[in-house]
Structures are given as C-alpha cells and as structure tokens.
Amino acid sequence: MTLITRPEGLSLDQIAPSRRSLGVATAGGLFFAAYAPAALSQSAQPIATDAAGLIAQDAAYPAPDGFALPAYVARPEGAGPFPIVIVVSEIFGVHEYIRDVCRRLAKAGYAAIAPAFFVRVQDPAPLSDMQAVQRIVAAAGYDQVMGDIGATLDWIGAQSWAKADKVGITGFCWGGKAVWQAMARFPTLDAGVAWYGRLSPAANATEEQKTAGRPWPIDLTGELKAQVLGLYGGQDGGIPNDTVKAMTDALAAAGRTDSQIILYDDAPHGFHADYRASYREADAKDGWRRLLELFGSRLKS
C-alpha cells in the first residue's frame, strides 16, 4: 500500500490554485504555463534567467531500476570542467522555477543538474490537483530517491565537462529533506544547502507516517559527510521553530560545528519560491548569497 503523507511544510490551503493557474488568459500565459499551477500565485513575478552563454538541455541516464531518468542540465558554454550542483525539486517536480534555479547556478559557473524523481509515476509539474500531486510524491521513497542521486553522480562522472570531484547539492521543501539524507549517504558530496525541508516527523504524525519518512534528518546528524547549510523560515507552519532548534542541538551534539541552520524570523515556508505568494525577496536573496558563498568555498577552491 502506498502511504500518502502531507508534503513537507505545506498544507492545502497554503497552495490553493490561483485564477492564473486555472487558465485565465494573460499576455504572459505561455511563460506562466511552465510553472506548477498547483502553487502559482496570481501576482507572481518570477525571476527569469536567460540561457545566454549557457548550454541548457534535457538529458536521461539509467537509474538502478533500469528506468531512464530524465534531468534538466544547465552549464556554462565551453569545455569546462565545471563544479557540479545537483538540484532537488519541491513536490512539483522539474518545472520552470527549478529550471531557472539551474540556469542561475550555471550563470555562477556551475553545471547544474535537476533529476525528475517523480516521473516514473507521472510528472506532477502540470497538475493543479494537490491530492494527485501528493500521491505521485508519496511513491518516490527513500531508496528510489537515493538511487537516483547515485545514478546522477555516476552520470556526472562520465561527462567531460564535469568536475566530478567537486559536487554540491541543494533542494527545496521535499528536496530540502532529501539534501540532508544525501549528505549523510554520499561521501562524494562536498557541500549541501537544504531549503526548508522537514527535519523530523510532525507532532501529530502516525507511526506509519513516521516510518514512511525515515530516515529523518534529525537522526542523521552524526552521519553527515560534509558541511550542510539549512535555510528555514520562522513562520513555517509545517516546520515549527522547536524542531529547527532540536536539529541545531543535534548538529552540535554530533560535533558538526561546520553545519548550521539560518532561521529567517518572518519568512514562511517556500520563501525562495518566486512564483508563489510565499516568496520573500530579501530572505531569498540572503539565502542565495549564503548558498553561493558555501559552494564557492567548497566547490571552487
């Protein structure tokens, strides 16, 4: 049986579809159609990063189960080799926001790869039905996701433009939790940045939900292979501040003094998602600055 659990940090009323997502025609309709309609804000003015000076393309490579795993890749023009950043999406998959994040990283000198973890079941990106999205996401378990990340690392190692000994990972919401998990599993990862990924089970979680979510980041602090930066919102209704404090304490107890969590006091969940009403420009920019500082020190040195 597939257990359906609420996506990390989100509730259905936080991501109600807007009039734009329901098909209101606008001059920029084709542009906005590339964003996840389940969360697109009517007043969104998302960042649009062009591909000038970049090579941006789709790729596919074999996962451990034989599935041809699709991914979006953006990298600077030229032979490289370039340091790598794996980008792990939110529950909405590889839609335009995630592709734009990849292009932003490529503009900063990285080769960015965003695997499409959910498409074995269905691509959630074009869906406006949140319950359908939840069912798709619930099917992507820990073993599959870690296997897909391992396959991504293998594929990176075979690319002439990739600096395969300098690899970072970042992810948002569902992907933020996966960052903590991956950093505890893969010694080839040199740094991670986790944006508002759930750290531990919700206070009202059932035993089934607790089991389905394992391993939880709070239980992995002693296994982290390299530095992790967590970026969290103080007004995130799905990730209470006391769980962030517990994670900070667990990192200290494990001796991971290089890893830290930044808590933006007034930020909600999804504060980096510029296509959603949750976007907080100042906090998103500060978090991005910190990401670039960490990756610059760990991947470009």
Task: Explain the meaning of each model-derived region.
Residues 118-143, 273-274:
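Cap/lid segment of the alpha/beta-hydrolase catalytic domain
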Residues 81-90:
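Short beta-strand element of the alpha/beta-hydrolase
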Residues 134-158:
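Alpha/beta-hydrolase active-site loop
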Residues 151-217:
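Primarily recognizes the serine-hydrolase "nucleophile elbow" in alpha/beta-hydrolase
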Residues 230-232:
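Short beta-strand/loop motif that positions the catalytic acidic residue
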Residues 16-21, 30-46:
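N-terminal twin-arginine translocation
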Residues 44-77:
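N-terminal cap/lid segment of alpha/beta-hydrolase-fold proteins
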Residues 1-17:
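N-terminal secretory signal peptides
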